Amino acid sequence: MKTSLKNLLFITGISLTFHIVPAMAQELSRTQATHLLADTWMRDPYIVIGPDQHYYLTYTNGKMEMPVWRSTNLQDWEKLGEDYNMKKLSYYQNILNSQKELIKERGEAKLWAPEIYYINHQWVAVHTSNLKQSSIITSSSPEFENISEPMKQEFGLKHDPSLFQDTDGKIWLINKCAEIQQLKPDFTGFIGKPIAIHPANRKMGHEGCQIIKIGNKYVWFGTAWSKDTLRKGTYNLYYATADKIEGPYSNRKFAGRCLGHGTIFKDKNGNWWCTAFLNGDYKSPTEVNKGVNPNIATSMNKQGLTLVPMSIEIKDNDIVVKALDPQYAQPGAEENQKF
């Protein structure tokens, strides 16, 4: 007679409690891009680590809401919701009243390029819109269910606003690819006038800026199409470095193909990543690297969220940024700038 484990335990009087342990999420590749959330349309994905050591994701969803997702491992994402939308702004009606002609042309309000941060013990978000008004808001939670408006409508129009907190605690706004301006610690206003920054050799691009600091070097990322013309070629990420945030900055360098308006961020293990998304006609990475029509917008990113492993190193007293997936690492033959 066969004795099952259950019968054996009954006979011997041993009581055991079994727990089903979920399989550990497989670590993301450090040599190839990973595509996630394939059913979710998004642009401008932004990822930050919160004080609870969770990753938080937001992005443009083509509507007036700011979606927020959460993850412990960058692979498995839980949608927290879309609690914040532009209708929550105290000056939302002012926007509608002042942009009636633009609304006829563009339709209802749409929230563009949101970014969220945890700065000075509170959550902070910035975004722009299709109706010539940007916003900076604060909240006690990453969902931004309840918000404060430290600058209200006086924040004005900022093209793809982004924030950077320096090691000395100063907070800077980056926008317009690029202009920087210091913010007050409580976000109620600006300190000083805007400062224009430029690569030494050419224009950086037209949108999607970010500044990080590696050692004592400032690394400024910006976005442009490879042909330097809107929606011509591939949507790429470039960078320049400086010893001071105000510059002078180095020549423009190549960060990654099809990484335009991506977030450069460091994970909990100290690895660097860049977010990416579909912008243009999709073609496989192999097809893109064989060559693209320079007159058509083309992307090797599928719909959803793409995470591309990156290398950021200090070499010869400068910063070298490189995509570790070789499909993203080199500019295309159609690239206007020669690197």
Where are these regions (language model features)?
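Bacterial N-terminal signal peptides
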Residues: L8-H19
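Positively charged n-region of N-terminal signal peptides that target proteins for export
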Residues: M1-N7
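Carbohydrate-active catalytic/glycan-binding domains of CAZyme proteins
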Residues: A25-F339
